[in-house]
Amino acid sequence: LVLVPTNGKFGERVAHICEQFCNVKHIKYDWGRSFDLYELEQQLERGCYEALLICHNETSTGITQDAAAIAEICERYNVSFILDGITSVGGMPVHPLEWNAEAVVMGAQKCTAGPSGIAAVAINQNFVERVETIRKQGDTNPLYYFDMIPALKKGDDDQTPWTPAINLVMGWSAALEGLQEETNEARWNRCAHMAKGVR
């Protein structure tokens, strides 16, 4: 069972995607309203949740979730913390190790300024072990192209299981080089300045 609180369009999309593959408890907050952390903690205390998944930066309503506080709650109840960081990675501080996030999903086309059509998932060892355990139990979800096990095995050799979209990979690589030259802090400050300008 996965707990997915939402307060905007993209969080709701995340919840809908999760519903295709697992059991979900979807808590819908009013769009633009921050999550009630006390309510989330009560849910985790009462339920048998394996994970809590959030859309970190909800661009449809301009709300950034307090990922550090949510991560702390997840750790308290031994629940995996998963982050949709598509519009936060590259544009604001994201600390997967500090937050003990099991997975962070990111898209090239947002704050890393890469081409659309390519994404990445940063995962920790616990996530890998969980995937392997679920696979051994005979998981029936369709996953051929998105199977992380062959991707991880090939990744050890700097390869991919199938032909990647080379033009997108090279485009994102160039964008990441630009981010490295600009520095994370300068990019975060630039994004914050632009956000303030349009509010």
Residue spans for each PLM region:
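Active-site C-terminal subdomain of aminotransferase-like
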Residues: T112-G197
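Active-site phosphate-binding strand-loop segment of PLP-dependent enzymes
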Residues: F35-G90, A103
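Short gly/pro/ser/thr-enriched loop/turn and capping motifs at secondary-structure boundaries
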Residues: F10-E12, R33, S88-G90, K110-G114, ...
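Glycine-rich, charge-decorated loop segments at or immediately adjacent to ligand/cofactor-binding or catalytic sites
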Residues: V89-W99
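PLP-dependent aminotransferase-like
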Residues: L1-C48
